[in-house]
Amino acid sequence: MGRVSLCLVIMFFICSAQKIDAQVQNIREKQDTISATKSLEHIRPENIKKGPLNNALDVLSGQSAGVNVTTNGTDRLAMLNSIRVRGTTSIMGGNDPLVIIDGVTSDIATLSTIYPADIESFTILKNATETAMYGSRGASGVIEIKTKKGTGRGFEISYDGNYGFESMYKHLQMLNGPEYIATAEALGLDYNNGGYNTNFHDVITRTGLIHQHHLAFSGGSENSNYRASFGFMDHNTIVKVNDYRNLVVKLDATQKAFDGRLVGDFGVYGYSSKIHDIFDTRMLFYSAAAQNPTYPAGTDVNGNWVKNSAASHINHPGALLYEKNDSEERNFNTHLGLKFNILDNLILSAFGSYLYSSTGNAQFCPTWVWAQGNVYRGEFKGEDYFTNVSLSYNNAWGDSHLDAVVGAEYLKQVRTGLWVQAKGITTNDFSYNNIGATSSRPFGGTSSSYEDPSLASIMGSVTYSYKDRYSIAAALRGDGSSMVSDNNTFGFFPSVSLGWDVKKEGFLSDTDFITMLKLRTGYGRSGNLGGITSYTTLNTVKENGIVSINGAPTVTMGSIRNTNPDLKWETRSTFNIGFDLGIWDNRLMLTSELYYSKTTDMLYEYDVPVPTFAFDKLMANIGSMSNQGVELGISVVPIQRKDMEMNINFNMSYQKNKLLSLSGEYNGMHITASDITPIGSLYGAGQNGGDNNVVYQIVGQPLGVFYLPHCKGLKENELGGYSYDIEDLNDDGEIDFSDGGDRYIAGQATPKVTIGSNISFRYKSFDIAMQINGAFGHKIFNGTGLAYTNMSIFPDYNVLKGAPEKNIIDQNVSDYWLEKGDYVNIEHITIGYNIPMKSKAVKSLRLSAGISNLATITGYSGLTPMINSYVVSNTLGIDDKRTYPLYRTYSLGLSIQF
């Protein structure tokens, strides 16, 4: 920490420093106007989808090649899981892009709270030649968001609101009560007949309702302006007791002084979100599908939930609705930026921001779900202190133009947490509000946490252009982190890029149909620390248990891992080459880019010998991974008239990932990790006692491949049904389901190709827009089909309607249930009408209507192909019988401006 602070102080006085977030945004935009080296993607107001949209992520989805927005299955609750920019580049973490909102460092959760009506534009940085300006924080891409500010046109008021409802249109087709009874009797099986015919999907779902309102005020003059906005959302989802509320307040003010030489920018953003959910939503869907349909929807005459003691993996769906998993998040950030034009071509900028966040979580499981019940309360707080200054210079002489920036920044974070868990509930009436009324607190269930990492950085960049045709840009950033070992505190990340504006050459200047042609290439390096925390490099201890010492209970402590004093930054090197082509006054625009990136010094837990080491795992920088791909963007304006216009935007991305190595040298010792490691597997009823691993991490393959036995078909078994006929792949005369046995690489879980398309058409005051997304080249393991077609679980658990006819009595995984995951999904269609206004008071009035999740074109036989196909986790590529029911959202919107 001392070295980091000393470096910051020295560089502050030497370099005069830089605002690497807000000022990098502003300065880079100015450089882009004279440089052809950049491959930035801008999503501007005319491209932002109009109509009923829930959050900023709806705006971003499908708009940029290689950018994948992944939500929680099909649960579009406005709570995001992740965004991936050009795939996964690290095993241990740090794969989410850096989010910059008006120059302030943010995260994806905060981005999901911003109202589309507040957004001016998105800018997406993918290559290391652009992200190098953000150093280690931008290793996985950068998403810059500019929000709307005051225009100086006088006082204005705008309102944007929409109302909508959600309707479930597809869920698993399980046996109903009469079918369940008939099947059990036909097979001669004993079963419990509760006397009802209950559709448990109807028990746990409802018609969802959503409404949101956004009000904005702006005003001022050319030298002083402001904009304030307020937003509110109330969302009752299709799952009962699952609700979401969000309140947002935003204020921005800009002041100019000294004839415009001094510009001050002040901003405040705050939100409060509340989520009311149950403890295990996935268990709820599982139980609703597998529950005996002859059981009642509610309690019996004595007020007790009817349970099937033979079905230990599920619970009564109605009982699960009384679980609670409530959370409340409050976030407040403020920033102040000053920009002073010392000379006409010399600008000094300073920026500071403060962020405070608080997240509280409370969980409750009643005694009719867990025998002793369970309660949990936790609160986590965070503070970010961010400051930086910059000095930028630009000059033009003759045919030359030069832009240069030097600067430094400092980021200090503080994270604290406190939580308690207890069992032995006295009464369910207290819920989670009286933990003192419990009789048991599990060891380790009560604890706290603290960390305060810091990051100091220096940076410099130069861009030179000649005759506005040839450009070269170079940048160097150094980051020093308190989380890295003292031996490797600092990392330095250079980049260089070249650009050529071919259209301005003499041999093309008279070619009228070509409006623009630019070529570009670049190389850059960036660092990543996403896989470590403040304590990873330290010899840390934790409590082992309680013993009696001299009659007093004493907590014993012990080390928890091997320490590595040489941990350092992961390094990602990227090369890219691309072009931008505009034809016929840019009514047809093509952009394409080829890239290759390689992650080296990759953090991972490697196998080490004991007793040479105290533990059998050591985190070290040894592995490597590559990503390569091609991106294509097409924009067409086939119709452009006063009363009629049509725009078609299409993007496509091909990507190939490969895990190159998980072995190497550490202090003269060769260490390695397993070449074959399971990532995802099936569990639950019918998956007990088998080798049920499905998705693997295998060296030499993409992250997340299916490594499965090969099924030749079905064969009759001694149980009177059918089993999977598994091929003896290693010809040893036995069928071995274990890892390394009779298995083969059957495909990958992540798409090779993704597409996105936005089509809009306007006729006079009417317009219609449609968003289409798709993915191809990957596979999905239909674990839902395997589990609910397995008749060995019946009648303890319900099965699919087609299961009795197939009569498969087998739980083993194989490629029998591996299917193509290709799909094209119509994300939404919006129809709008801009009412012609004659009133001076009302400037514009727009009505809109929209349908989300309209239709999916796919050959996949399961509920939906839109599962987790991007994030490397235990759900990657697996449809695991716990999928959220499919629903559509129908919305009406109103926008008015005074």
Residue map of PLM features:
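Short, small/polar-rich motifs associated with maturation and membrane association
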Residues: 1-257, 262-271, 317, 331-333, ...
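Acidic, glycine-rich flexible loop segments
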Residues: 282-317
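C-terminal beta-barrel architecture of Gram-negative outer-membrane proteins
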Residues: 733, 767-827
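Glycine-rich, aromatic-lined ligand/substrate-binding cores of catalytic
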Residues: 748-780
